[in-house]
A protein has these predicted regions:
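Glycine-rich ATP phosphate-binding loop
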Residues: 10-16
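Single conserved hydrophobic/aromatic residue that forms the stacking wall/gate
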Residues: 1-9
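Extracellular glycan/ECM-engagement signal in secreted proteins
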Residues: 172
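Hydrophobic residue at the +6 position relative to the catalytic HRD Asp in the kinase catalytic loop
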Residues: 151-155
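ATP-dependent phospho-/nucleotidyl transfer catalytic cores
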Residues: 21-26, 36-144, 156-157, 161-163, ...
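Amphipathic alpha-helical "output/dimerization" segments
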Residues: 30-34
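Conserved catalytic-loop position in the HRD/HxD motif
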Residues: 147-149
Length: 181
């Protein structure tokens, strides 16, 4: 990869483990077969078939790196004018359904409050900007990061950097209107 790009700084590769799709498919099929053995009382509490189906849908989306690359492009475009938000640069010409190539992001985890304070960051300001951006993603863009845990958020150069766009949520205008009420 480095020979293909002269301007290489530091890149990050996300590589799909060989055979993972088939393994997951078999695991989901086994979970569906095991539903026969769940006591009727438990079946009434939770729609386990639906839970397994939702899990499989989400897993398939996360295993498609071309979809994640498209999510990265959409997220980047939606936030291009938000001065305190960034995301990794995508190298789409090198990305495939099984390999995602992007800029490596260092920086501080949002949960590393001690270091952030030592480096002069205002934790309240970070929290306010994070909340502001997340509400904007939901209410304005209708396209939001669906896995916003500390491992997917970094602080670098005064910006909040969002990582891992494998799971993104989408809202229709009607959905946004209902939430606003």
């Amino acid at each position: 990869l480095r020979r293909q790009r002269q301007m290489c700084i530091r890149d990050s590769l996300k590589v799909q483990r060989r055979g993972i799709y088939g393994t997951m498919e078999r695991d989901v099929a086994m979970m569906q077969r095991m539903l026969r053995f769940v006591p009727p009382a438990l079946k009434g509490l939770v729609d386990l078939e639906r839970v397994i189906s939702e899990f499989w849908s989400a897993a398939k989306e996360e295993m498609d790196f071309l979809r994640e690359a498209a999510n990265m492009e959409t997220f980047s475009k939606n936030n291009e004018n938000v001065v305190f938000v960034a995301s990794p640069k995508l190298y789409s010409e090198l990305t495939t359904a099984q390999v995602l190539v992007m800029e490596y992001i260092d920086g501080y985890s949002v949960s590393d409050t001690h270091t952030l304070e030592q480096e002069g960051y205002d934790l309240v300001e970070i929290g306010e900007k994070l909340a502001d951006n997340y509400v904007r993603q939901i209410m304005q863009d209708g396209f939001f990061h669906a896995d916003p845990h500390p491992g997917n958020l970094r602080i670098r150069g005064g910006k909040i950097v969002w990582l891992d766009m494998g799971m993104m949520g989408r809202l229709t205008p009607r959905d946004k209107s209902l939430i606003a009420k």
